[in-house]
Amino acid sequence: MKQNVIALVFGGRSSEHSVALRSAATIHAALMALGHRVHCVGIDREGNWRYQGEPCQFPGAVDRSAPLISIRPGHRSLSYTTQESGTVEIGIDLLFPALHGRWGEDGTIQGLAAMCGLPCVGSGVLGSAMAMDKDVTKRMVQSAGLVVVPWLAMNSMRPWEELVECLGSSTLFVKPATSGSSIGVSRVSNALEYAAAFAIAAREDTKVLVEAAVCGREIECGVLELEEGLMASVVGEIIKKEGHAYYDYQAKYDSNSVTGLRVPSLLPPDIVARIQALSVQAFRCLELKGYARVDFFLTEEGEIILNEINTLPGFTSASMYPKMFECSGYPPPKLVGALVEYGLSSASKERL
């Protein structure tokens, strides 16, 4: 593979800042193994872009004393200024966002890259924005014939009794419309719990979703876009053990979590094939690019229900997406290499 100059952008203002740092460390190691030049750009929690070096040691936090980054529209470059070196301009072939949540996964960074003429790994503005909003995602894929979890979207609280009647369940999930990593998500079964959960979710977003609880297995499938077409990974399953009612933040990222991942799943081949086909269908429905992880519930009756779609899935050591593709013949360096290749080739077709 040709050596490219890649700006790896990580951190960000969202509540998933710490997860993004861990994803970036994995991606950085893969890019270095492939022989690319990697310039690291950390976005601190206040939204400042800071140059972290080439390469980066990933100390666990964005260095807030590092120089600020400037981007000029129309120039495929980043620049920063120090007293010792003056202004340093770095030509960039590709932007690789390792960002999760708002101001990174929602189309904002993708729009900035497009305005500046910088090729960018992953989905564009439209697909990123639609997939980030769980309400919009559900409406889009439901219109395409996929089954989704029953839900209501709201900007202010509605009566508990009304929600139970509308959703047909007395156990509900309350979540922000645009957060990830299960941040701000609560499982509730009465009006008091609902009021507290709504307040938590509303701290993350002005739009809050309330969903009916689904009794079923939690299944995930990855999609990777290659020059020859879309590839669905093996299917993985989240194994919830005693102590976790659902796959929350602790279960996802705590090394002592009692929740496990089974990759590949032990599902029958026909069910796996259906999940893979639905993953590709959802990917196309939202006009996504590059890669995504699609999450489902599988009920005892065999119904496959789409839960949500992540356009910048986690790349941590505990993340399902890289595990599923490693079992599909794409270990992290090969997987990241495929993302780089497609990001560059799709940009050339779009004449960025």
From Swiss-Prot:
Binding site residues for Mg(2+) 1: 295, 308
Key words, A-Z: ATP-binding, Cell shape, Cell wall biogenesis/degradation, Cytoplasm, Ligase, Magnesium, Manganese, Metal-binding, Nucleotide-binding, Peptidoglycan synthesis
Pfam name, any one: Dala_Dala_lig_N
EC assignment: 6.3.2.4
Binding site for Mg(2+) 2: 308, 310
Cofactor binding summary note: Binds 2 magnesium or manganese ions per subunit.
The protein's name in its UniProt record: D-alanine--D-alanine ligase A
